[in-house]
């Protein structure tokens, strides 16, 4: 109640950008400028795991990024920064999402790599 929320249409208004066309760094920069400090992202995708079913909610705890054609950092050009990705997700926010999903009796799988 009384919380401000920012919404960003990842694929643009009208869903017009392919994933490879999305300017992720601009999106993150814009959210940061708005004062956003936590992000909840929704995605629909398939899985090779037979124990995941359509409609299941999965709360990731790690990322495997196999993309190669887009910039991976805000740094460079003489600026070297080392940022740990050992725990890329906020544990307290993940726990809130898990509790919310389970309260609806929806199948929820916590701690799954994405």
Residue ranges: model-predicted function:
Residues 88-114:
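Active-site rim beta-loop-alpha module in soluble metabolic enzymes
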Residues 1-85:
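Metabolite-binding pocket within alpha/beta catalytic cores that recognizes anionic/polar moieties
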């Amino acid at each position: 109640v009384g919380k401000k929320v920012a919404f960003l249409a990842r694929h643009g208004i009208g869903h017009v950008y392919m994933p490879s066309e999305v300017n992720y760094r601009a999106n993150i920069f814009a959210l940061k400028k708005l004062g956003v400090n936590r992000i909840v992202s929704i995605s629909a995708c398939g899985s090779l795991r037979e124990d995941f079913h359509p409609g299941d909610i999965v709360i990731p705890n790690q990322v495997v990024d196999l993309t190669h054609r887009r910039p991976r950092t805000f740094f460079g050009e003489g600026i070297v920064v080392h940022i740990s990705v050992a725990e890329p997700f906020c544990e307290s926010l993940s726990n809130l999402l898990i509790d919310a999903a389970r309260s609806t009796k929806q199948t929820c799988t916590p701690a799954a790599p994405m």
